[in-house]
Curated annotation (Swiss-Prot):
GO process terms (BP): DNA restriction-modification system; methylation
This enzyme's EC code(s): 2.1.1.37
UniProt source species: Neisseria lactamica
Keyword ATP-binding applies: no
InterPro entries: C5-MTase, C5_DNA_meth_AS, C5_MeTfrase, C5_meth_CS, SAM-dependent_MTases_sf
A single GO molecular function term of this UniProt record: DNA binding
Active site annotation, chain numbering: C74
Encoding gene (name): nlaXM
Keywords (A to Z) from UniProt: DNA-binding, Methyltransferase, Restriction system, S-adenosyl-L-methionine, Transferase
SUPFAM superfamilies named among the record's database cross-references: S-adenosyl-L-methionine-dependent methyltransferases
Boundaries of every SAM-dependent MTase C5-type domain copy: 2-308
Disulfide bond entries: none
Name of the protein: Type II methyltransferase M.NlaX
Length: 313
């Protein structure tokens, strides 16, 4: 039985990926500060208790576990910290991950973040993180993976950090599955008319796109149809106007994707409950992870941990 903890849990996408990959995994602790995300998390995980602010949590209150998982927010590391030669991570949420790793020493961890972390502050932020993880005793692997390489029609890239306490572990990130994707795979047959954008909004998007093109800037919206291979990245801002992912509709204005489509775009099953408003749902799925990517990484982690365990026998 593998025990995991789910930090910065959001709606539980990382946990879901681990549960799909492991038949013998149990989440023993979850932490999430956003009350609406907690509502969705609890609706899908039996209403279990979710700890609030991890910065206020005593490590003594966190159960022992085998795997720490976290989709932690990317916060700029202080210049002072960088000048100290990676000595200071305090004041960032990464520090809370670090203090739990140091206190609990789980066998492994999986951290997820935006791809931009790789180049943030000319790469120094990632160097700070890696240095601290290594000083905590972990052998660390990093990779940027794309959702569309794992059967999901979304152009979403994220960086993943996987670490093992046992340096004999031989871990490899999963390879692309080689499956063609199509936006039609996630579309509902009969979406509600309320998701069709108004004439005023559509005219505004087109005008802005023309202005941006004339100014040599990128276009202002993303238009897709069932045959498109993939969409743009769904972000937490999607609830504002939905312009990054619009779906063509014959004979009328394009529409936003629906919350169930947003869930599918992150690889959540149709059985996943969405007990919150559309605005909160878009924010939650935009903030979440691509579940099939997590599952693929978790399967590789399980294989690596099992191989080391078998060698000990």
């Amino acid at each position: 039985m593998f025990k995991i903890i789910d930090l910065f849990a959001g709606i539980g996408g990382i946990r879901l990926g681990f549960e799909q990959a492991f038949d013998d995994v149990r989440c023993v602790f979850s932490s999430e500060i956003d009350k609406y995300a907690v509502q969705t998390y609890q609706a899908n995980h039996g209403g279990e208790t979710v700890c609030g602010d991890i910065t206020q949590t005593d490590v003594a209150d966190i159960p022992d576990h085998d795997i720490l998982s976290a989709g932690f927010p990317c916060q700029p590391f202080s210049q002072a910290g960088l000048k100290k030669g990676f000595a200071d991570t305090r004041g960032t949420l990464f520090f809370d991950i670090e203090r739990i790793l140091l206190a609990k020493k789980p066998q492994a961890f999986l951290l997820e973040n935006v791809k931009q972390l790789k180049g943030h502050d000319k790469g120094r932020t990632l160097q700070v993180i890696l240095a601290h993880l290594q000083q905590a005793g972990y052998k660390v692997y990093t990779e940027v993976l794309k959702a569309r390489d794992f059967g999901i029609p979304q152009n979403r890239e994220r960086i993943y950090l996987v670490g093992f306490l046992n340096h004999d572990v031989d871990f490899r990130f999963p390879q692309p599955i080689g499956q063609a994707t199509a936006v039609g795979d996630i579309l509902e047959a009969y979406p509600d008319e309320k998701y069709t954008i108004s004439d005023k909004l559509w005219q505004g998007y087109q005008r802005r796109k023309a202005e941006n093109r004339a100014a040599g800037k990128g276009f202002g919206y993303g238009l897709f149809n069932a045959e498109s291979a993939y969409t743009n990245t769904i972000s937490a801002r999607y609830y504002k106007d939905g312009s990054e992912i619009l779906i063509e509709q014959p004979g009328k204005n394009p529409r936003k994707i629906t919350p169930p489509e947003a869930a599918r775009l992150q690889g959540f099953p149709d059985s996943f409950q969405i007990p919150v408003s559309d605005a909160q749902a878009y924010r939650q799925f935009g903030n979440s992870v691509c579940v099939p990517v997590i599952r693929a990484i978790a399967e590789q982690m399980k294989a690596a941990l099992s191989a080391v365990s078998d060698r000990k026998v």
